[in-house]
Amino acid sequence: MKISILAVGGKMPAWVQEGYAEYAKRLPREIEPRMVELALANRSKSYSVDAVKQAEGEQILGAYDNAPGHKRLICLDVLGKSLRTEMLAEKMAAWQMDGVNPCLVIGGPDGLSQSCLQRADEKWSLSGLTMPHPLVRVLLIEQLYRAWTILQNHPYHK
């Protein structure tokens, strides 16, 4: 199983890069998380939110279409399904058994396009709270690591 994280935006602060790297390196080779950073759409003074989301959505879906193997598109969205870490662990176990390579999508500051949300196999919400997107990267990779530790009966989750 290869996990792809498709994230709109680049040039993250050092603490984000360090936090992400810390948890990514803890995951075993067979999970092999891959961060794909996609450019923010141009936001001029008179930009249209829908046009920006559409441009970013095209990049996201293009990256998804180029991801390897049998895939699932999972969009992170405030209106998505809330998961407990144990449920995420169950999903990871199923992905491994079924040979699925999940693509987890973190949208830009304006959210995800309707085309992304409509094409998603699943929509998840990490929290009912609004979070800065850099923090979501660290939170997501930590939760993937935590779910993996549950599957391994590792004491990290306790």
Curated annotation (Swiss-Prot):
S-adenosyl-L-methionine binds at residues 76, 107, 126-131. Its main location: cytoplasm. One of its GO terms (cellular component) is cytoplasm. Its EC number is 2.1.1.177. It is found in: Cytoplasm. It holds the Pfam family SPOUT_MTase. It is an enzyme of class 2 (transferase). The keyword Iron does not apply. GO terms for molecular function: rRNA (pseudouridine-N3-)-methyltransferase activity. InterPro entries: Alpha/beta_knot_MTases, RlmH-like, tRNA_m1G_MTases_N. Keywords: Cytoplasm, Methyltransferase, rRNA processing, S-adenosyl-L-methionine, Transferase. Homodimer. Specifically methylates the pseudouridine at position 1915 (m3Psi1915) in 23S rRNA. NCBIfam families: PRK00103.1-4, tRNA_RlmH_YbeA. This is Ribosomal RNA large subunit methyltransferase H. It comes from Teredinibacter turnerae (strain ATCC 39867 / T7901).
